[in-house]
A protein has these predicted regions:
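Membrane-anchoring hydrophobic helices of lipid-metabolizing enzymes
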Residues: 1-80, 88-92, 99-101, 119-120
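Non-catalytic C-terminal accessory region of glycerolipid acyltransferases
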Residues: 2-4, 103, 134-275, 485-491, ...
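Glycine- and acidic-residue-rich phosphate-binding/metal-coordinating active-site segment common to enzymes
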Residues: 117-121, 127-161, 165-182, 187-193, ...
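Conserved N-terminal entry element of GNAT/NAT acetyltransferase domains
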Residues: 271-309
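Short amphipathic alpha-helix that is part of the acyltransferase structural core
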Residues: 294-349, 353, 361-362
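Acyl-donor binding region in acyl/amide transferases
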Residues: 334-337, 370-526, 530-533, 541
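A short helix-loop-beta-strand connector motif used in the catalytic cores of GNAT acetyltransferases and
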Residues: 342-351, 525-528, 538-543
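Glycine-rich phosphate/pyrophosphate-binding loop shared by adenosine-nucleotide-utilizing enzymes
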Residues: 358-363, 401
Length: 572
């Protein structure tokens, strides 16, 4: 139960206010009204209480719908905001985030933890004595480790009246250290509000007096609107700089928020918000119209879908949304709301569907290139936009399938991963066995250190070289330098592979899963990396053009990916 006595005992245990002072403080704290509210809504907890408080006070959080879309649906996130009014700032941002996701907490003044129905949402810090308990620091750590949202008011105290107007006090840098630890994106929020003249006058008299007025300031905003602006998220790779101190990064974040307030471009490069998910029932209905190729070993359904001029295509929108989520998670992505391009209309989409959760597990975009050549010519083939083709590529184009834009959405990572995708490809090849080649661009994240990219390109050029120069990148990756090539002996594949893993490990990296998978599916000579090039339209990743000759497919891989579906087709 919220009471003045509890607050005083916790924050000012030495205080002995006179009866008349206590009576005044109870009024300033709206103790009676809080207790009546708590009695009336004792069944509510957490975010439900936040919504009810705002409804009770008739305060409307005026947040544009587009701004709400800036809040990512999953993954660790640090929201940084100015702190103009006090308690209401935290409630407004909790309410905003709850429209999108429920795993949110706010770092706030210890006094507010006495609002018991809301206490589960608060991580308390002691702004009065400038201390933060170890337990609170652990809570912050756990919140981001679990992939949740953490709201910070880096000023630590409510904004003050200055010569330049109402401004936050100097920001603390604690949020930078936590966000860096979990590589969390930052999301700036600007609350356009101010307190009363009485409040700002109190800040000139005492540091403690403004705290006593915070509840009064919240209640005075009854029957009003609280405008909130949420900016685009700043990916970790865009805000973090190992050469800068936490204090310097904090200053840049404050500058970025100030630019948001003014409606100007911020200090950091931002990303568009990822689009909201499509209706599950619509997706299920669309997939039931598609060709079913079979099932994976654990029951995921494999569908083959093509747009075929369909005007409204929720499946394609969802594929584009999930692609962008998966690619951003590994430092790639288009930076757009959905990763969709002009090739998606013509191409086939191999989709893995989880019937139980009504989720697209992952997908491959692909096209038998002979069909597309007859229909659109070379310009209709995606990889041709990245690589020039030699005439000797004709055999591959006539008897091959171009693969690309493969993804597994992050919630399914670590289960069967790429095995799902290869099972899907195998299901298609079991039904259409006359194709000999698989080929397409395979990316190395632009987020990897340059040294790691150089090592990967050098290794795959050395051990999976093109027998003929069938293609050449339009933006060639530089030739491997002698000192990079010298890292590998070139005589024993396994020794060099172990060396590559060790060198990448020293850089905090690993072999990209698709590169690992392609290098393992065939007998020697069955896989080639024809050329490598840079892709500025895809977050500056490196594209390697891989070519797989299916006649070299290892027997165990054939049985696992293709043979299993042949048996299923016969039994069907």
């Amino acid at each position: 139960m919220f009471s003045l006595d509890n607050v005083l005992d916790d924050l000012w245990p030495q205080a002995r206010p006179a009866p008349w002072q206590k009576k005044l403080l109870k009024k300033l704290f709206y103790e009676e009204e809080f207790q009546q509210f708590a009695d009336r809504h004792r069944h509510l907890k957490g975010l439900d209480t936040v919504e009810q408080v705002l409804e009770y006070l008739n305060i409307r959080c005026a947040i544009p719908a587009h701004d709400l879309e800036q809040i990512p649906e999953y993954g660790p996130l640090v929201i940084i905001a100015n702190h103009p009014t006090g308690t209401l700032d935290g409630l407004a941002l909790l309410y905003a985030v709850s429209r999108v996701r429920r795993d949110v907490k706010v770092v706030t003044n210890r006094m507010l933890t006495h609002l018991e129905p809301l206490s589960s949402l608060f991580i308390p810090v002691d702004n009065i004595h400038g201390r933060t308990a170890k337990a609170a620091l652990q809570q912050m750590d756990q919140q981001l480790q679990a992939g949740g949202v953490l709201i910070f008011f880096p000023a630590g105290e409510v904004s003050r009246l200055t010569r330049r107007g109402i401004r936050d006090k100097k920001w603390h840098s604690g949020f930078i250290k936590l966000a860096a630890k979990y590589r969390a994106p930052l999301l700036p929020a600007w609350i356009n509000a101010r307190n009363s003249a009485l409040f700002y006058a109190s800040t000139l008299i005492s540091d403690n007096l403004p705290l006593l007025l915070l509840m009064q300031q919240m209640f005075r905003r009854r029957n009003s609107s609280l405008p909130v602006r949420i900016g685009q998220q700043i990916p970790w790779s865009n805000w973090f700089d190992a050469q800068s101190s936490a204090r310097e990064l904090t200053g840049r974040c404050y500058q970025h928020l100030e630019q948001l307030r003014k409606g100007l471009p911020g200090r950091f490069k931002t990303e568009s918000a990822i689009a909201r998910p499509e209706d599950r029932a619509l997706l299920k209905r669309e997939l039931h119209k598609a060709e079913c190729l079979g099932r994976t070993a654990d029951g995921k359904v494999i569908y083959l879908w093509q747009r075929n001029g369909q005007e409204d295509a929720p499946l394609l929108r969802e594929l584009g949304r999930l692609r962008e989520i998966a690619f951003r998670a590994v430092g790639e992505g288009s930076g757009k709301r959905r990763d969709i391009d002009g090739y998606d209309d013509d191409y086939l989409h191999l989709i893995l569907w989880d019937e139980e959760d009504l989720e697209i597990v992952g997908a491959y975009r692909f096209m038998p290139t002979a069909i597309q050549l007859a229909k659109r010519g070379l310009e209709g083939i995606y990889s041709y936009s990245l690589f020039h083709y030699d005439g000797r590529m004709d055999d591959v184009l006539q008897h091959g399938i171009e693969l690309g834009r493969s993804f597994i959405q992050p919630r399914y990572w670590g289960r069967r991963g790429l095995d799902y995708l290869w099972s899907g490809i195998g299901a298609y090849l079991a039904r259409y066995p006359h194709y000999r080649y698989l080929f397409g661009p395979v990316s190395i994240s632009g987020g990897l250190p340059p040294a790691a990219r150089d090592l990967l390109v050098a290794f795959y050029r050395m051990w999976f070289p093109a027998t003929h120069q069938l293609a050449e990148s339009r933006r060639p990756y530089p030739a491997s330098l002698p000192d990079v090539l010298a890292q590998f002996g070139g005589e024993d594949y396994n020794d060099d592979l172990a060396r590559l893993k060790s060198l990448l490990g020293n850089l905090g990296c690993a072999i990209p899963p698709l590169y690992k998978q392609y290098s393992e599916v065939c007998e020697p000579g069955g896989v080639q990396f024809i050329d490598f090039g840079s892709d500025p339209d895809f977050n500056n990743c490196v594209d390697g053009l891989v070519l797989v000759d299916l006649t070299y497919l290892k027997a165990n891989r054939y049985q696992r990916y293709i043979g299993a579906h042949l048996g299923a087709q016969k039994s069907a």
